[in-house]
């Protein structure tokens, strides 16, 4: 159903930084394609923020910086390489060594990257606002509908529902969050656990945290940010790789 499920569980950390570091992605698909993907991601965050502002959606949308901490997946040397690769691609990123990180943020890691182009929002309010705007422009919202199977036939996508109906479309976009359809499961990875947590209101926290999204180069990993009412919202996720790509 709209504005339920994984929407309500979302931490709404809207990051331009995609899961694969730029210097790693460049080795996989080439420097030019990788840089383009990262630049488009940064532009997408800014476009979303401006769209929410233009539509007048009240969802606590706020521009944020991101603090990416060294971890067990990528250490200080990898983060130095990553920051340099981003600079070369025209994406601003500042590398902090352990001493600078401790001095500025009071955190003990071997290194970190500070970057712009991220944001946070209330996910339920933002989703509801965007859906209302879409419907005002002629989109149709149908709920509840359970899609049980998907099949591609030429230029057409066919969806089967639990009621026995078949829906056809030229394109289908799945925005299911953590709820995977069986036909979308991948041999590349398997989710072991994922948790979203929120603290009590007015939790004691450093002042700088209100302006940052914090995440780490680890597996399992932890992300966290502040939310309205003085809460701290966090997200932890563990995947089990089954096949390297």
Regions found by a protein language model. Give the residues of each.
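Short FAD-binding loop at a beta-strand-to-alpha-helix junction that anchors the flavin cofactor
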Residues: 230-235
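Flavin-dependent oxidoreductases
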Residues: 149-227
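Helical element adjacent to the flavin cofactor pocket in flavoenzyme catalytic cores
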Residues: 113-156
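Glycine-rich FAD pyrophosphate-binding loop
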Residues: 1-9
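Dinucleotide-binding Rossmann-like beta1-alpha1 core, especially the glycine-rich loop
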Residues: 14-98
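A short, glycine/Asx- and small/polar-enriched loop/turn
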Residues: 74-77, 104-110, 151-157
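Conserved small/polar residues in nucleotide/adenosyl-binding loops
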Residues: 236-242
